[in-house]
A protein has these predicted regions:
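N-terminal localization/anchoring segments of enzymes in phospholipid and broader phosphate metabolism
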Residues: 1-256, 274, 278, 290-312, ...
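Hydrophobic alpha/beta core scaffold segments
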Residues: 281-285
Length: 517
């Protein structure tokens, strides 16, 4: 461990009891107050829409995709609060997995119930480490008049689904939200996630069907627009992979970009291997568990895997399939873990709006260019940090998202974006879908020049060791004198942290409560 993390022996401590790191939440505020700017990120706030922005009205014009934490969750909360007071809204239904301890989202649901609307909340009590918090919220929801469902006995409900039903002069209409992350105001400022909001009638009807099935503990077997695990999630994605494989075998420059947290599902791994052998270029962005090896000759030589670990926790799931002519892209709450594909109720959706397809494609391409937070897997399963070549500009995909989404509230068309598209992005055109029969037509040979070799990487700059400063502060030791040649740094003004982590029980308290049960 010392070797892999490049630590000296004096940085390692041995103890028999479980390690409780909850003190770090308090430590961060103390360290900032005492002046240690080098240990902190520059404050960054989620971008807000114009003051007159109305998400519910915007969704009636076109689909909307919010990207957290770069864009604020406040427009979604405002839409819920408005629905709670709208006399034409007859019901609000939502799946709740992890909620903030002071949740405006749950407050909006309770307000809607108090206003006489039908409110259905599916609360998953088995959300790890949030069991007590979810129990407390479920009691308050019931007291406010909400119908609370506690999910399945054999399947954990991990989906992020909201359905607002409105009855107007022209009949019923829906606003459906499908996300990759929780309805949690705190984590929406720490995790990267995507929230798709639409007024599509067919998606609304399918979402209504999902809630009806959840109410009677039945799984959703049929859906057209939505992916619903465990019966209609993996099968749809495998079909998409088969479609791309067929395109590659006919000579098209087919490719896939798959972004999620983890992968362990055997069926998907075997299909990825088949796609690689068929000539499909596969780029995977996998932050956590990865049970497939990249670039193994004869098996996964066309499969490239990278992990992004930076300021924010990469939590979004995007699945993009390019058959050489057209792009089909999905977002979902589920990863490629067997527990997600077979043992949980997950929800995903195909994004069809051309502007949003291009937006998601730009996000994926930006992350594939990252040379600051990225580590790539080699054939042995080891990860190597990406080192920029000499003269190559640094690309931090997380910070680049602020620029990418700078004009997003104005909804610029893809061809009006300020960021120029790369050759790869130009190839991934957004067009109507193509059938397998069309793929079987004779195709012209597609010439693709070999990629240029990067120049020799420049030696990495030596990073300052902040451990010494941390130890000195904790032990109230004076800091070592700086060399005379260096001017002392100006004191940093005291500012509050960007996000304050919610108070949780310590690990020892959780273990003790477990044994008391």
């Amino acid at each position: 461990l010392c070797s892999r993390l490049e630590l000296t022996r004096k940085r390692v401590f041995l103890q028999k009891s479980p390690l409780d790191l909850s003190f770090f939440f308090k430590l961060s505020g103390r360290m900032e107050a005492e002046g240690h700017p080098a240990l902190f990120y520059t404050p960054a706030r989620p971008m807000l829409p114009p003051p007159d922005y109305d998400l519910a009205a915007e969704v009636q014009k076109h689909d909307v995709l919010l990207s957290y934490p770069y864009q604020s969750i406040r427009p979604f909360i405002a839409m819920l609060k408005k629905a709670a007071q709208d006399p034409d809204v007859i019901s609000i239904k939502m799946t709740l997995y992890r909620m903030a301890r002071e949740s405006q989202i749950v407050q909006a649901l309770m307000e809607a119930a108090e206003n006489g609307k039908e409110v259905v909340a599916l609360v998953e009590l088995r959300a790890r480490f949030d069991e007590q918090n979810n129990i407390d919220w479920s009691k308050q929801l019931e007291s406010a008049g909400c119908t609370v469902i506690y999910g399945f006995e054999d399947y954990k409900v991990h989906s992020k689904l909201t359905l607002i039903t409105r009855k107007g002069a022209e009949g019923y209409s829906y606003i459906t939200q499908i996300g990759t992350g929780n309805y949690n105001e705190k984590t929406s400022e720490l995790y990267t996630d995507y929230s798709f909001i639409t007024a599509d009638e067919r998606i609304g009807e399918e979402a209504s069907k999902v809630f009806r099935n959840l109410a009677v503990q039945q799984l959703t077997e049929e859906s057209d627009k939505m992916l619903v695990a465990p019966l209609r999630f993996k099968s749809v994605l495998l079909d998409e992979m088969d479609h791309v494989i067929a395109a590659a075998r006919m000579g098209r420059p087919a490719s896939m970009i798959l972004k999620n947290n983890s992968i362990s599902d055997r069926d998907i791994i075997l299909k990825l291997q088949e796609a690689s052998c068929a000539g499909v270029r596969i780029d995977m962005i996998v932050r956590g568990i990865c049970c497939v090896r990249a670039e193994v000759p004869g098996k996964t030589e066309n499969l490239h895997i990278r992990s992004l670990v930076g300021r924010y926790l990469e939590h979004g799931r995007i699945y993009s399939f390019f058959d050489g002519t057209h792009t089909r892209i999905y977002i979902a709450s589920g990863d490629f873990l067997t527990r997600n594909t077979e043992c949980r109720v997950e929800v995903g959706v195909r994004v069809e709006d051309p502007v949003l397809v291009q937006k998601l494609t730009d996000i994926l391409q930006l992350q594939l260019r990252d040379n600051v937070n990225a580590r790539v897997m080699d054939a042995s399963g080891n990860y190597q940090k990406v080192k920029p070549a000499e003269g190559e500009p640094l690309v931090n995909s997380q910070m680049g998202m602020y620029e990418l989404l700078r004009n997003d509230w104005q909804r610029l068309e893809p061809w009006k974006c300020t960021t120029p598209a790369t050759e790869t992005e130009k190839t991934a055109a957004v067009c109507q879908e193509v059938t397998v029969e069309q793929l079987k037509q004779e195709l012209p040979h597609v010439f693709q020049p070999a990629p240029e070799k990067a120049e020799k990487a420049a030696p990495a700059a030596q990073q300052p060791d902040h451990y010494e400063a941390l130890e000195q502060m904790l032990n109230n030791k004076p800091r070592a004198a700086q060399p005379a040649s260096k001017a002392p740094a100006a004191p940093r003004p005291v500012v509050k942290p960007v996000v304050t982590a919610p108070k949780k029980k310590s690990l020892l308290e959780r273990i003790g409560s477990f044994f008391r049960r």
